[in-house]
Amino acid sequence: MIAMIATAIIGIVAGGGLGWALHKFFRARTLRLAREEAQDILDEANEVVELRNLEERERIQEIEMELWTKVEPEMLKSEGRIEDLQEVANERKAKADAIVQEEKKKLQDREADVKVQEQALRGQEAELGKLKEAQKALNQELVQKLTERLGTSAEEFKTQLKNQMEEESRRRAARMIQETEADTKEHAESEAKRILSLVIDRFARPYCAERGIGAVNFPDAHIRKLFCDPAGNNIKAVQDACGCDIIVEEGMEMVGVAGFDPVRRELTRRTLERIFKEKKNINPDFIRKIAENQKKELFKNIKHDGDSLAKELKLEGLNAEIRQMMGSLRYRYSFTQNQYFHCGEVGWLAGLMAAELGIDIKKARRVGMLHDIGKSMDHTVEGGHAVIGADFIAARGEAPDVVHAVKAHHFDEQPSTDHAFLVIAADAVSGARPGARRSTIESYNQKVSELQDIARSFPGVTDCFVLSGGRECRVMVNGKKVDDTQAMDLSRKIAARIEEECNYPGSIKVVVVRETVVTEQTRKELA
């Protein structure tokens, strides 16, 4: 059994080794055959590649020959052009060299000419120096001879000549200024007269001159006795209720009213008239009741007057306090001219002039009406009425240009707008028209005295006369001390001094009169 198994094992091992040997043999044989076949294929491929390379080289040679055949004629032509261009360049270079040589020659010739001119110039400069020295010596000799002949030094002569030339220049300038002023004034005055004549013709506002009443007459002796009680309680009651002083003189049949506030004076006057009309038992309680009723009625009238004036001038947006103050001007007078009607006149005149000049008409009327509003409160506030009024309307919303025109209408500040100058002109027209204003003898004498003192304070003035109701100042001067040019300058200085120191309505004409009187006596004796 074991032998059989061993025999089987040996057979299996021997069969396996034989199989492995056969497998290895056939594998080696297959690899050899594959290598031989691959080598054959590689050889064939190399032969094909070599053949193709040969064909490609032949094709390239053919293409090169074909291209050379086409390009060769063009290359030959290009070579011919290059030769032509080279010849042209050579010719141009030769010409340029010739031009350069010619310019060098010209430059050399010019340099030679310059040297010759420099030498000539040096000679002329030397000769000029000699001439200057000769001229200097001649001038010195001339100055010396003139000095000896005139008897003064050169500096003194120069000073005299300078002064003469300055004086002549001043005279010419003064003459030119005079001619220019005459032409300007002639044109300006004619245009102003034309506009004013049109405005005055178009303005026909009704006006009745009136005067403020400062006294109330007693109806009879009985009323006087009732009012003037021994203790003076009635008079004191009127003074306390109305704010004005009551003046009752023995033997006078009237009651005087004194006070700085025109509205309070009017209230006092109305209260007294009402008390005297009642003819009842007059006592302090009755007086206070009458005064209160009259105060309400007066303020109602003031408001109505302010509203009426604003409505008449077609002004809108006016503050209620402004209208109230305008109404209070109904009882304010300046040089006997009622300021309520004066403001209305100025408003209309300013509007008409604005229409002629193409300026805002409504604003001109507004400024004209408001220009003297400060007079309604100048008794309670310090300062000029123009400044007071301007501050008042500025605090109540008026435009800056309106405020400026009100403030500048008496030159409290320099006017700089058209409306400011319009108000100045309209104010002058309203105040200077005949019958508008009157002055007392005391104020007139004071005005005359001030004008004469101002005119006589200037050197050369011999006398002064005030004419035309204080609207003309005629100044007489010494003809030996003041010439024509100085007379013209003197008139301007006097006018400027009057504007600066005096405050009067309207304009004042200054006339300077220079008189030259020449006399000669005959020497021949009569037979």
From Swiss-Prot:
Where is the protein found, in the record's own terms? Answer: Cell membrane
Primary location group: membrane
Question: Upper taxonomic classification of the species?
Answer: Bacteria, Pseudomonadati, Bdellovibrionota, Bdellovibrionia, Bdellovibrionales
The Enzyme Commission number assigned here is 3.1.-.-
EC class, as a word, reads: hydrolase
> What is this protein called in UniProt?
Ribonuclease Y 2
How does it sit in the bilayer?
Answer: Single-pass membrane protein
Functional note: Endoribonuclease that initiates mRNA decay.
- Its gene is rny2
Q: Superkingdom of this entry's organism?
A: Bacteria
User: Could you tell me the Gene Ontology terms of the biological process aspect for this record?
Assistant: mRNA catabolic process
Residue intervals of the HD domain: 339-432
GO terms assigned for molecular function: RNA binding; RNA endonuclease activity
Membrane-spanning ranges: 2-22
Q: Which family does it belong to?
A: Belongs to the RNase Y family.
